[in-house]
Curated annotation (Swiss-Prot):
Transmembrane segments: 7-27, 39-59, 71-91, 101-121, 132-152, 431-451, 455-475, 492-512, 516-536, 550-570
Species lineage: Eukaryota, Viridiplantae, Streptophyta, Embryophyta, Tracheophyta
GO biological process: auxin export across the plasma membrane; auxin polar transport; auxin-activated signaling pathway; basipetal auxin transport; negative regulation of ethylene-activated signaling pathway; negative regulation of lateral root development; root hair elongation
Gene of this entry: PIN6
Protein name listed in UniProt: Auxin efflux carrier component 6
Binding site for (indol-3-yl)acetate: V51, N112, L114, Y145, I530, V531
Known tissue expression: Expressed in the vasculature of the primary root, cotyledons, floral stem, sepals and the main transmitting tract of the reproductive silique. Expressed in embryos, shoot meristem, root tip and lateral root meristems. Expressed in the nectaries and the floral organ boundaries of the anthers. Detected in pollen. Expressed in broad subepidermal domains that narrowed to sites of vein formation. Expressed in veins of mature leaves.
Any single Pfam family the record assigns to this protein: Mem_trans
Subunit structure and binding partners: Homodimer.
């Protein structure tokens, strides 16, 4: 039975964290103390210094030679059970699919262990649980977040291949080469493809950034260069309603990617021409960055910092976009202002006003809303450019969609995943902490005091600043439940009921009993991890649902975890 003293101990551990979160919320929502630019600086400090150093501090002090193998096995089995069940559901049921597999796996198995788990479990079940939580943090950072990133890149690669090579053409791809400046396929930067076909019909595909081969002299010739800041800071706080700039599609095997951002611009990225923006008439050039991604997660895998690279289009006197001349192409393409038209319920195209296909005008705002919905539904919709003579043959007539061989896809995904992990500070902090702990506890080498105190002074700020950053993020959201009540309820049930049930089953299966079993169950009922939300936002996969679980879940998780604590103590 839980005593009042034990309950008070738990509240003493949790109240300071929530105090920091609500202070940040009030300072932005009501007092207007911090501007978004100032919030960006706070997030930058937390994401680059405070929390990576906090991770290093915990991991380096954990003895890897005394790891609780049964506890780790239970956690691993629970995640494997969930992944296998979701995979079977995605394969054998029409309602399933890779998109929901990724989202539901994130919700059910990846809680906020570092910031919430360590202080909460330590207050509930004692100091030994800190070691257990640190072990789970290591596994999350090194294994599970890498797996999640792999799945997201797989989805992005499939969308790109389907857009560029509909039907059976993709089956002929023998090699995919990714330029060094392409960090990810998430669409944050406009991409273009170049293809070569040998005498045997095998295709060699090259993925490039849209401006990687365009000289500065060509870029500077544009009449309407839009000034945008560099993305190297990459720490802005954003709302879930921030315009999405990561939706892209191609128009067949011609090497053209069409990239849609949330600034009412359409990015045309051609194999011969650099990508440029089409600005919505009447609104002028947008000051938003194409490559910018703002992360509210101060202690998660941060999106890959990239320098800004832009290639804008020329605009003549009447607002008609003009394709810039490319040294590779040696010619100039011009396109009149496009009209958006629906081809079917889930497929729409950009056609020339002189095209022969019947047209139904819709606003650019509607088109940009419809495009991500079609992608989320299955990734089968595409936008085509009629003026360039694209093939409008329905996908069903082309044949069943094929993909390159597993080896080709594996090489592609491993390449981009490795590049992305290499630019994440938490990757280095986790690995360095693990390496130091292996050395330190093997030969009893203490960390020098000057290094230890330097790390401690920064890591001590990690927990409070991480919660402060979450409060800033919550304050900037227009809605607490942006995904709607139905999806929010489903997500909460999966997070706070299904997750602990799978963890309890796996723990009992491996023989966990007593306080370790209770700690495993309560750990699975922690609020939603932030890293899955960052990935969901970056790859545009159900970000509203993950945002709801981050915001509302932080509030709901405290009474839920205490309820589990009380019930398990009966």
């Amino acid at each position: 039975m839980i005593t009042g003293n034990e309950f008070y101990t738990v509240m003493c551990a949790m109240a300071p964290l929530y105090f920091a979160m609500f202070v940040a919320y009030g300072s932005v929502k009501w007092c207007k103390i911090f501007t978004p630019a100032q919030c960006s600086g706070i997030n930058r400090f937390v994401s680059v210094f405070a929390v990576p150093v906090l991770s290093f501090h915990f991991i380096s002090q954990n003895n890897p030679y005394k790891m609780d193998t049964m506890f780790i096995l239970a956690d691993t089995l629970s995640k494997i059970f969930v992944f296998v069940l979701l995979s079977l559901w995605a394969v054998f049921f029409k309602a399933g699919g890779l998109d929901w597999l990724i989202t539901l796996f994130s919700i059910a198995t990846l809680p906020n262990t570092l910031v919430m788990g360590i202080p909460l479990l330590q207050a509930m079940y004692g100091d030994y649980t800190q070691t257990l939580m640190v072990q789970l943090v290591v596994l999350q950072c090194i294994i599970w977040y890498t797996l999640l990133l792999f799945l997201f890149e797989l989805r992005a690669a499939r969308l790109l291949i389907r857009a560029e090579f509909p039907g059976q053409a993709a089956g002929s791809i023998a090699k995919i080469q990714v330029d060094d400046d392409v960090i990810s396929l998430d669409g944050m930067d406009p991409l273009r493809t170049e293809t070569e076909t040998d005498v045997n019909g095998r295709i060699r595909l090259r993925i490039r950034r849209s401006v990687s081969s365009v000289p500065d002299s060509v870029m500077s010739s544009s009449l309407c260069l839009t000034p945008r800041a560099s993305n190297l800071s990459n720490a802005e706080i954003f709302s879930v309603n921030t315009p999405n700039n990561r939706f892209f599609h191609g128009g067949g095997g011609s090497g053209t990617l069409q990239f849609y951002n949330g600034s009412n611009e359409i990015m045309f990225c051609n194999g011969d021409l650099g990508g440029f923006g089409f600005t919505r008439p009447g609104l002028g050039a947008s000051p938003r960055r194409l490559s910018g991604y703002a992360s509210s997660d101060a202690y998660s895998l941060q999106p890959t910092p990239r320098a800004s690279n832009f290639n804008e289009l020329d605009v003549n006197g009447n607002g008609t976009p003009v394709w810039m001349k490319s040294p590779a192409a040696g010619r100039i393409y011009r396109q009149s202002s496009p009209k958006m038209m629906w081809e079917s319920g889930q497929r729409h195209a950009a056609k020339d006003i002189n095209g022969s296909v019947p047209e139904k005008e819709i606003s650019f705002r509607d088109a940009l809303k419809a495009a991500p919905q079609a992608t989320a539904a299955g990734g089968g919709a595409s936008m085509e450019e009629g003026a360039a003579g694209k093939d409008t043959t329905p996908v069903a007539a082309i044949g069943k969609q094929e993909m390159p061989s597993a080896i080709v896809m594996m090489r592609l995904i491993l390449t981009v995943v490795g590049r992305k992990l290499s630019r994440n500070p938490n990757t280095y902090s986790s690995l360095l902490g693990l390496v130091w702990s292996l050395i330190s506890f093997k030969w009893n080498i203490p960390m020098p005091n000057i290094v230890d105190f330097s790390i401690k002074i920064i890591s001590d700020a990690g927990l409070g600043m991480a919660m402060f950053s979450l409060g800033l993020f919550m304050a900037l959201q227009p809605k607490m439940i942006p995904c709607g009540a139905k999806k929010a309820t489903m997500g909460m049930l999966i997070r706070f009921i299904s997750g602990p049930l799978f963890m309890a089953g796996a723990s009992l299966l491996v023989g966990l009993r007593g306080s370790r079993l209770h700690a495993a169950i309560v750990q699975a009922a922690l609020p939603q991890g932030i890293v899955p939300f960052v990935f969901a936002r970056e790859y545009n996969l159900h970000p509203d649902l993950l945002s709801t679980l981050v915001i509302f879940g932080m509030i709901v998780s405290l009474p839920v975890t205490i309820l589990y604590y009380v019930l398990l103590g009966l």
